[in-house]
A protein has these predicted regions:
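Alpha-helical transmembrane segments of multi-pass membrane proteins
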Residues: 16, 40, 56, 60, ...
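Hydrophobic transmembrane alpha-helices
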Residues: 1-42, 46-51
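Membrane-embedded alpha-helical segments of multi-pass membrane proteins
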Residues: 10, 25-42, 62, 82-91, ...
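Interfacial aromatic-anchored transmembrane helix boundaries in multi-pass membrane proteins
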Residues: 19-27, 54-94
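Central hydrophobic cores of alpha-helical transmembrane segments
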Residues: 12, 48-59, 108-116
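Juxtamembrane membrane-interface segments at transmembrane alpha-helix termini
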Residues: 41-50, 61-69, 121-124
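Membrane-embedded alpha-helical hairpins and interfacial helices in multi-pass inner-membrane proteins
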Residues: 98, 102-161
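Helix-boundary and loop/linker segments of multi-pass membrane transporters
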Residues: 1-5, 25-26, 70-71, 101-104, ...
Length: 161
């Protein structure tokens, strides 16, 4: 892969991540698409993971310390549920790396749906296990997933578009 291609792909991923700073519906961001794109177009697995995760972290730094600074005591390097968000994101990169070895419309659509489902399941599990909002029971987990359903279609749309 040429240096020019790497630069273009990296710039595209960073711009997509920074789009999270624009006003949007909750979860209507290209987070899964960024991971899938990186996985599909970086031939080196290391960069397919590092560049999208770094772009996510940079946009999180800006969001947490500018837009949501009132929610934190001091400078926030990471959000409280980062392990679940970044873990889901990393799993989407792995999904994309294997699913998008050959890029076709069907595989991209399948990847976008798979990315959305992975993100939904992992991140909402994180909400359930790490916050006092839900009891740590099967009913609490189900309640958490049900409460998150209204946000799922925005995640899916953000990944597809």
């Amino acid at each position: 892969m040429s240096k020019k291609s790497i630069t273009i792909i990296t710039a595209f991923i960073i711009l997509a991540a920074l789009s999270r700073l624009l006003p949007h519906a909750t979860n209507f961001t290209p987070i899964g698409a960024i991971a899938l794109f990186g996985a599909a177009y970086f031939s080196d697995k290391k960069w397919a993971l590092i560049v999208p995760l770094s772009a996510l972290w940079i946009s999180d730094l800006l969001l947490n310390n500018i837009m949501y600074s009132s929610l934190y005591d001091g400078f926030a390097w990471l959000s409280s549920g980062f392990i679940y968000t970044y873990g889901a994101f990393a799993m989407v990169v792995v999904l994309g790396y294997y699913l998008l070895k050959k890029v076709t419309a069907g595989r991209v659509l399948g990847g976008a749906i798979g990315a959305s489902v992975l993100f939904y399941l992992i991140c909402n599990f994180g909400v359930w296990v790490s916050s006092p909002m839900y009891p740590i029971t099967a009913e609490g987990l189900i309640s958490c997933y049900v409460a998150a359903i209204p946000f799922f279609h925005y995640t899916l749309a953000g990944n597809i578009i």
